Curated annotation (Swiss-Prot):
Name of the protein this chain belongs to: ATP-dependent Clp protease ATP-binding subunit ClpX
Keyword Membrane: no
Annotated HAMAP family: ClpX
GO CC terms in record: HslUV protease complex
ClpX-type ZB domain segment(s): 3-56
Keywords: ATP-binding, Chaperone, Metal-binding, Nucleotide-binding, Zinc
Protein source organism: Cupriavidus necator (strain ATCC 17699 / DSM 428 / KCTC 22496 / NCIMB 10442 / H16 / Stanier 337)
Gene from which this protein is expressed: clpX
Annotated CDD domains: RecA-like_ClpX
Length: 425
């Protein structure tokens, strides 16, 4: 390395890029037969930074330029999610407006558009998580699912709310620009409700305290995340992620919310306009669409958090017909998945309508909704999938209502058309 000062007897050295001599610059760094000065190094670094920033912006702009319309979003949701028409319509509009807002962020305007996060209310297995997953896949943005019940306030045992952003970064290879336009789905948000609608004087590390921590994340903050998933410790460089433009979708079953709504409506419905139906006759799916912010506060969510979730969509409990549709109609329907698994063995799978109905009824009895369909079907096909690789000449497996109810094993059809019961020799 050549210093600026030198004796007159020294050979004068020059930067190979700008041509300045060693006396005109602070430092001159030598390589194999070449030299570069500190000024050229600074210029190179500046060019690299500018080009990297420009490429990130171009990539983000390209990703936003093909934003689907609400109708297109709804049509895509229809391919994977059965029923819940009103919820899909609300989500399509909310997501379209959110990413349309991001598309115009760089433009100067007198009107500043606020972010509209989403709250999904519906029973277990009604499609809340699937809706959020499908939206993220359609929009090709980073997506993460967080379980609110595992979160605690900072400093307590459990997951810090900023771990959510860390997982989002992991899902996009730590590209901060991509993560800042992602979607976060927070499940079981109802499980962190405070125990009463009055502020508590005692510490509630997994309830109201977590709501307060989530509030900062949802409304927009600079989250500090350790690089490449490391643990937080002093004197460490953190990745700074701005959560202002991340779309947060919160979901929960909110068991008992319908009672809160009915109590309110019964107080205001006295007289000729009162509800004719009794409380027992009014189904939760009928009552939940009437949810007001005051009901959610009574349930245990803090007012500030409710204010940051202005878009509310309610999902209804799936009936037998809807569950039967879910088994066969979506792109990734369960019946199609198991048919493909058996086709890999060269065997056709036939599930008769009576069996589909029996699966749906069993899921309703278990109160698991669509989430419980796979376990019922898996249980019915377990013996067949275990024995099938050892059988020769099986052409078709037939599942009927008796198989689902456990009264008879699946029927195996052989090449010579001789039916055989699975498990028999």
């Amino acid at each position: 390395m050549a210093d600026k000062k030198g004796s007159s007897s020294e050979k004068l050295l020059y930067c190979s890029f700008c041509g300045k001599s060693q006396h005109e610059v602070k430092k001159l760094i030598a390589g194999p037969s070449v030299f570069i000065c500190d000024e050229c190094i600074d210029l190179c670094n500046e060019i690299i930074r500018d080009e990297a920033t420009a490429s990130e912006k171009d990539a983000a702009a390209a990703a936003r330029s093909d934003l689907p319309t609400p109708h297109e979003i709804r049509e895509s949701l229809d391919q994977y999610v059965i029923g819940q028409e009103q919820a899909k319509k609300i989500l399509a509009v909310a997501v379209y407006n959110h990413y349309k807002r991001l598309k115009h962020l760089g433009k100067k305007d007198d009107v500043e558009l606020s972010k509209s996060n989403i709250l999904l209310i519906g029973p277990t297995g009604s499609g809340k998580t699937l809706l959020a997953q499908t939206l993220a896949r359609l929009l090709n943005v980073p997506f993460v699912i967080a379980d609110a019940t595992t979160l605690t306030e900072a400093g307590y045992v459990g997951e810090d709310v900023e771990n959510i952003i860390q997982k989002l970064l992991q899902n996009c290879n730590y590209e901060v620009e991509k993560a800042q336009r992602g979607i976060v789905y927070i499940d079981e948000i109802d499980k962190i409700s405070r125990k009463s609608d009055n502020p508590s004087i005692t510490r509630d590390v997994s309830g109201e305290g977590v709501q307060q921590a989530l509030l900062k994340l949802i409304e927009g903050t600079m989250a500090s995340v350790p690089p490449q998933g490391g643990r937080k410790h002093p004197n460490q460089d953190f990745l700074q992620v701005d959560t202002t433009n991340i779309l947060f979708i919160c979901g929960g079953a909110f068991d008992g919310l319908e009672k809160v709504i009915m109590q309110r409506s019964d107080k205001t419905g006295i007289g000729f306009a009162a509800q004719v139906k009794s409380k027992e006759e009014r189904d939760a799916s009928e009552v939940l669409p009437q949810t007001e912010p005051e009901d959610l506060i009574k349930f245990g969510l803090i007012p500030e958090l409710i204010g940051r979730l202005p878009v509310v969509a309610t999902l209804s409990k799936l009936d037998e017909a809807a569950l039967m549709q879910i088994l066969v109609e979506p792109k990734n329907a369960l019946v199609k998945q198991y048919q493909k698994l058996l086709a890999m063995e060269g065997v056709e799978l036939e599930i008769r309508p009576g069996a589909l109905s029996a699966i749906a009824r069993k899921a309703i009895r278990r109160k698991t909704g669509a989430r419980g369909l796979r376990s019922i079907l898996e249980q019915s096909l377990m013996d067949v999938m275990y024995d099938l690789p050892n059988y020769k000449g099986v052409q078709k497996v037939v599942i009927d209502e008796n198989t689902i109810n456990g009264d008879a094993p699946p029927l195996l059809m052989y090449e010579e058309q001789q039916p055989k019961v699975a498990g028999s020799n």
